[in-house]
Amino acid sequence: MIFVITVLSGGTGTPKLLQGLKRVVNNEELAVIVNTGEDTWIGDLYLSPDVDTVLYTLADLINEETWYGVKEDTFYTHEQLKNLGFDEVLRIGDKDRALKMHKTYYLKRGHKLSEVVDMEKVALGIKAKVIPMTDDRVETKILAKVDGKVDLLKFHDFWVKRKGDVEVLDVIYENSLYAKPCEKAVEAIKNSDLVIIGPSNPITSIGPILSLNGIKELLKDKKVVVVSPIVGNSAVSGPAGKLMKAKGYDVSVKGIYEFYKDIVDVLVIDNVDKEIAKEIPCEVLITNTIMKTLDDKVRLAKNIIEFCGSL
């Protein structure tokens, strides 16, 4: 039987699955370890975009049109800052800004990120555990060729400012060799009956989590299911395909298996890729992985739990 579940998540793809999981499992036995490689400062404001997306998703506040920020938010402060000549890289809503101000206030007073996120999840009425991958600074950067010159870009410069329209040479997890995973993250994995790696970008959303000391070793001792973010030969959303190519992986479910082969026990792939299943050297669950409706999300969550519970 599967009672305790830990999910590894970025800010896209996996939150849709979380909407399904929160409706089919005991939320108090659900933990979500979230990528912080895209955390950044904009002026004096600390942003933890993937963490905030997970918080909003579990609190039923997420803007499902963008999968970033709060639904029906306003942007008066962002627009006024722009009028004053301060152009934020990310478009931050007014309600969303309050959460970021809360983080900033406590981080500047010496609190750990994981402590602040715990305060926020309680305030938002979330029963599941939401855990930043680390309390240390890890930053995902994109080595790219820009206007004929090699440059090291922050992720938001690459994806938001430049729309990913550069030649990617490599992806680097800056400082991950020295960062420690959150103790709560380690504890969550150890206590899990099942670890689900959601359909987030493997390179920039899950890769930073796996790069932390000891995480892969912990996962090798657990039952790990990976939900492929690739359907056919393209990513469901975001720059996963482009970044997988840059890291030398085929943009296919076979490429996803290769990326996770040291830890994966079950690979979940879409019906579109059923002919490839026999080429994957691990257990494979073939199902609909495209999550357009809440029913799709709940059905996928149930299918994963039932399939893994039978192994």
From Swiss-Prot:
GO terms for biological process: F420-0 metabolic process. Its cofactor is Mg(2+). Pfam families: CofD (PF01933). Homodimer. This is 2-phospho-L-lactate transferase. SUPFAM superfamilies: CofD-like (SSF142338). Belongs to the CofD family. Pathway: Cofactor biosynthesis; coenzyme F420 biosynthesis. It comes from Methanocaldococcus jannaschii (strain ATCC 43067 / DSM 2661 / JAL-1 / JCM 10045 / NBRC 100440) (Methanococcus jannaschii).
